[in-house]
Structures are given as structure tokens and as C-alpha cells.
């Protein structure tokens, strides 16, 4: 629930934040470094937390967030300890940290443990300080258990009546090394590993996945291992990595998973993604669009390794993993409109509204695509930006199962 907390954190800057000056010696590394002044400006934000998602339901609690500013008066460190309650998971205690020592270097961590089923331990680092900024390293380590996971079946027309619940216990890593070729091109080599266990879910009243489906029907239902290597080619003219307002982006990716290297099955992923950003009126209005084609080829591919739609970054009218099959097509279109910019407690926040349309479908093969299977999800997003690094959002999408509300970090694309 740290995503929900993040947006509420930004909102609370207008309500309950206070600013203090703390000697830098009292804030040792990695909280501060030589980019901070002395004393350090710290904005403290205590606030209640209320969050909702289609799969998890309602979560409530409280947090205190600390925003540490560097000598350029930018938020360079954020810490957010939190405690919350959800009827499915009990009490969860967590701490989230984000550190931005350089524009080309950042790391994040999250430590969360619930009294029932759920836990979330993550560490992420991005560093592009090697080879004069041409070499980019990304590392993501995780151990996560989500007791709210859902499975409805394969193909586009899976009815809601087939809904099942399970706990997805996922431990693994994702590594990549990218090298810039010229100004706009990058080649990326990646390595990914995950060990997935499927256990009894935490949501009462919804059947357990293995009570309705078998391993023959749903490969990976008893757990699986994936060890994959990938190669990507990227072309980008974006003017910023996290919050672009101008430019285009294209990526082609091939990923291979093989039994000989420890995977549960032999299969391949192919994906093509294109997105663009067109600004108007000095970027007060930004038209953002994305198109994706994803395909999975192989036999007995674990269900969580197939092509998946649904959730906060794809079809926002549905919960995560709502549609699963061999491939999918996806189109996202939204108009990001900056309503106002407001400075409170020496922190400047941009507030945006973003009407959007998500259109997509899963299918057995591209040749079997049918217009009647396309999901049309209109919706509205509200975003708050504390530049250059903090982006919180609430997106409300509408699908055939009813409305879905997502609260998260960063833009959906």
C-alpha cells in the first residue's frame, strides 16, 4: 500500500506538513551525502492512509513521511514508515525509502510484513554513471507474497463467475545492462529469475485456484521456476526518463526461457512497444499514447509467464492479471492536463488531471484477433508531481466488471 501512501503524502503537503532544519551529522549516509547542505531541510508529513484496489479491497492506517531536500532544494531522499490494516491481511508494518543522490543514480527499498499471508521485500537500483554515462545498470531484488491474486481462466471472454483466489509467493531478481549507441539508441541485455509458489489465498468467499482448475488445465498452478535471458533494442527521443513531456520511444524485446537453465518450461517472449508525448501550451497539455504487442510461444508455459492484461499499467478498468493468453495487443491514450502549480511549506507540487482510454485484448494468436474481444476502458486520472522524482496518481477505470480504482507511483507509461 506504499503507492497509496505516496499520493496521500503529496496531498498532505497542503494540510499537515511541517519543515525543520536538521544538522547533516544527524542524518548519516545514505540519508544524506555531499549534495545536501548543512543544515538539511526536512519536511515531515504525518497523515492517515486510506487505499482501495480491485483485488485487495480497502486498507486503512497511518504513516509519517520524511522528505529530505538537497542544496538545490530538490527532494533527494524520502522515508515513509507506515502501519495499516486490511481485513484480508491483518496488520501490516512497513518502511519505504527512495534515494536520488544523482540524476543518473537512484535506489529504492521497501520492507513490509503483514500478520497474514502478505510480505513485500524489494530493493531496486538504477545507475548510469559508468562509461561517461553510456552504460546503464538496473538491479531489482524481490521477495513478495500477495494473498489477493486472482485467476479467471484463459482467453478474452473469461466470465467473472470463474474467479479464483491464491497467494502468489514470488522470489527472484531482474538484472539488465544497457549501452548507449549514439544519442538516441540503446541495446540492453537482461537476466531474470523467479521462483513462484502458489498457496491458499487470503480473500474469504472466493474459491482457491486448485479447487477449480488442474495443472493440466493451468500450467504452473503448483508452482514454477522461470530463468530467462533477454535482448532489447531501444530508440528514444524523450526529454526525461520519469516524467517526459516531449518525444518518442520504441522498444523491441526478445526473451528466451529454457529448461536447461533451470526454467520449468521452454518458451519465448516477443514484445514491441511504442509511445509518444506531444506537448501544447508550454507542456500544460501533454497528449500521451502507447501501443504494445506481446506474444508468448511455447508449450506448457506457466500461467503467470504468459501474456497478461489488467491492472494499473495496462487495462485500468480491471484488476491485475484479469486476462491471460498467448498474446495481447494494447493501446493507451491519455491527455495530461496541468491544473495548477502550488508551493506550500517550500515544496512545489504540480497537479494534473488525465482523462484516458485503454483498449486491448488477449488472444490465442494474432491471426485470431477479433474486434468483439477488445476491452474498452475509459477513465480519469489525478496526478500530483513533486519534481523531479515524485509522482503520485489515482486512476479510476471502467470495465465490464465495474469500476476499478488504482493508486500508485509514477505514470502508467
Predicted regions and their residues:
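Bacterial Sec signal peptide processing site at the extreme N-terminus
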Residues: 17-34
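Outer-membrane beta-barrel "beta-signal"
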Residues: 19-21, 231, 274, 382-384, ...
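C-terminal outer-membrane beta-barrel translocator/porin domains of Gram-negative envelope proteins
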Residues: 26, 213-222, 226-351
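Short loop/turn motifs that connect adjacent beta-strands in outer-membrane beta-barrel proteins
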Residues: 34-43, 69-77, 102-104, 130-136, ...
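Gram-negative/organellar outer-membrane beta-barrel architecture
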Residues: 38-40, 44, 52-219, 225, ...
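Residues that define the transmembrane beta-barrel architecture of outer-membrane proteins
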Residues: 42-44, 56-60, 89-93, 117-121, ...
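Membrane-embedded beta-strand positions in outer-membrane beta-barrel channels/transporters
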Residues: 45, 61-63, 78, 94, ...
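Membrane-embedded beta-strand positions of outer-membrane beta-barrel proteins
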Residues: 46-48, 79-83, 109-111, 137-141, ...
Amino acid at each position: 500500500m506504499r503507492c497509496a501512501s505516496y499520493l496521500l503524502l503529496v496531498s498532505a503537503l497542503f494540510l499537515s506538513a511541517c519543515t525543520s532544519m536538521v544538522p547533516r551529522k544527524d542524518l548519516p549516509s545514505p540519508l544524506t551525502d555531499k549534495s545536501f547542505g548543512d543544515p538539511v531541510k526536512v519536511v515531515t508529513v504525518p497523515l492517515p492512509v486510506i487505499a482501495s484496489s480491485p483485488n485487495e479491497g480497502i486498507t486503512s492506517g497511518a504513516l509519517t513521511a520524511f522528505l529530505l531536500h538537497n542544496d538545490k532544494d530538490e527532494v533527494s531522499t524520502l522515508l515513509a514508515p507506515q502501519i495499516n490494516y486490511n481485513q484480508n491481511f491483518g496488520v501490516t508494518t512497513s518502511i519505504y525509502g527512495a534515494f536520488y543522490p544523482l540524476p543518473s543514480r537512484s535506489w529504492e527499498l521497501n520492507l513490509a510484513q503483514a500478520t497474514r499471508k502478505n510480505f513485500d521485500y524489494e530493493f531496486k537500483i538504477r545507475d548510469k554513471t559508468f562509461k561517461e554515462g553510456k552504460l546503464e545498470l538496473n538491479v531489482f531484488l524481490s521477495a513478495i507474497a500477495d494473498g489477493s491474486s486472482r485467476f479467471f481462466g484463459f482467453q478474452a471472454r473469461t466470465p467473472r463467475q470463474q474467479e479464483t483466489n491464491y497467494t502468489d509467493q514470488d522470489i527472484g531478481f531482474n538484472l539488465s545492462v544497457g549501452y548507449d549507441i549514439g544519442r538516441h539508441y540503446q541495446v540492453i541485455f537482461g537476466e531474470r529469475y523467479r521462483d513462484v509458489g502458489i498457496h491458499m489465498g487470503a480473500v474469504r468467499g472466493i474459491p482457491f485456484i486448485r479447487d477449480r482448475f488442474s495443472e493440466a488445465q493451468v500450467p504452473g498452478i503448483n508452482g514454477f521456476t522461470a530463468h530467462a535471458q533477454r535482448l532489447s533494442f531501444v530508440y528514444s527521443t524523450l526529454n526525461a526518463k520519469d516524467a517526459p513531456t516531449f518525444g518518442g520511444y520504441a522498444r523491441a524485446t526478445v526473451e528466451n526461457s529454457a529448461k536447461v537453465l533451470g526454467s520449468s518450461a521452454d518458451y519465448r517472449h516477443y514484445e514491441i512497444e511504442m509511445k509518444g508525448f506531444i506537448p501544447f501550451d508550454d507542456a500544460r497539455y501533454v497528449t500521451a499514447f502507447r501501443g504494445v504487442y506481446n506474444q508468448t510461444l511455447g508449450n506448457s508455459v506457466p500461467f503467470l509467464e504468459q501474456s497478461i492484461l489488467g491492472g494499473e499499467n495496462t487495462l485500468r478498468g480491471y484488476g491485475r492479471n484479469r486476462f491471460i493468453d498467448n498474446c495481447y495487443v494494447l493501446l493507451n491514450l491519455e491527455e495530461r492536463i496541468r491544473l495548477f502549480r502550488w508551493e506550500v511549506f517550500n515544496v512545489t507540487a504540480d497537479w494534473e488531471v488525465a482523462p484516458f482510454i485503454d483498449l486491448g485484448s488477449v488472444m490465442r494468436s494474432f491471426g485470431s484477433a477479433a474486434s468483439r474481444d477488445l476491452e474498452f476502458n475509459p477513465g480519469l486520472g489525478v496526478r500530483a508531481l513533486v519534481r523531479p522524482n515524485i509522482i503520485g496518481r489515482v486512476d479510476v477505470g471502467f470495465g465490464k466488471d465495474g469500476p476499478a480504482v488504482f493508486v500508485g507511483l509514477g505514470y502508467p507509461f
